Amino acid sequence: EIDVSSGNLTLDVAGDIILDAAGGDIFLKEGGTHYGSIKRNNNDLQIHSETSDEDMLFVGNDGGSVITALTLDMSAAGAATFNSSVTENSDERLKSNITTIPDALSKVTEMRGVHYIRKDTGLKRTGLIAQELQKIAPELVSTGEDEMSTLSVSYANVVGYLIEAVKELSEKIAALEAK
């Protein structure tokens, strides 16, 4: 169906994909209900879930150096590769109840680094076992919403434990050297 007056082109007999020529947007529908959209906002690309304001992929320039060939490669096995770095907001203004990690050295000592073969890909990997880590530092482990409630590890957040453990070791070494 083509609606010349609005500039919209609807693909599919049921109208499940709508191309908005005026705004350059693509709207995804099912049975008349909007489920998502792909939008252009200035020079940014935004992929939205219409069912939640929190479900959005944003690709754009934040005012820093422009990456002319930004790549996100997602494999069928669920691996994601970026051609740049991934960062997480860590601004103090976003946090409350900030405390230093206590007994980090003893917790790091309990952690077991392992080599393993992924059953789904056959690839050799290095890391931690989520079930073991959950007993030591449960805040580093998340439970998936899949049928198996698969556990995942926030490896970036393990760094806080490692930093505090090194500081504890440094204090022990300094005390020994002072004797």
Language model regions located:
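Long amphipathic alpha-helical coiled-coil
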Residues: 159, 163-177
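Beta-strand-rich receptor-binding modules of extracellular spikes/adhesins
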Residues: 1-87, 93, 148-149, 169-172
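Short alpha-helix boundary/capping segments
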Residues: 61-64, 70-73, 100, 154-161
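Conserved, well-structured core segments
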Residues: 17, 127, 160
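C-terminal intramolecular chaperone/autoprocessing and neck/assembly modules of extracellular spikes
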Residues: 80-155, 172-179
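Generic signature of intrinsically disordered, low-complexity segments enriched in small/polar residues
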Residues: 38, 61, 85, 119-121, ...
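Short, electropositive, low-hydrophobicity segments enriched in small/polar residues
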Residues: 64, 131, 164
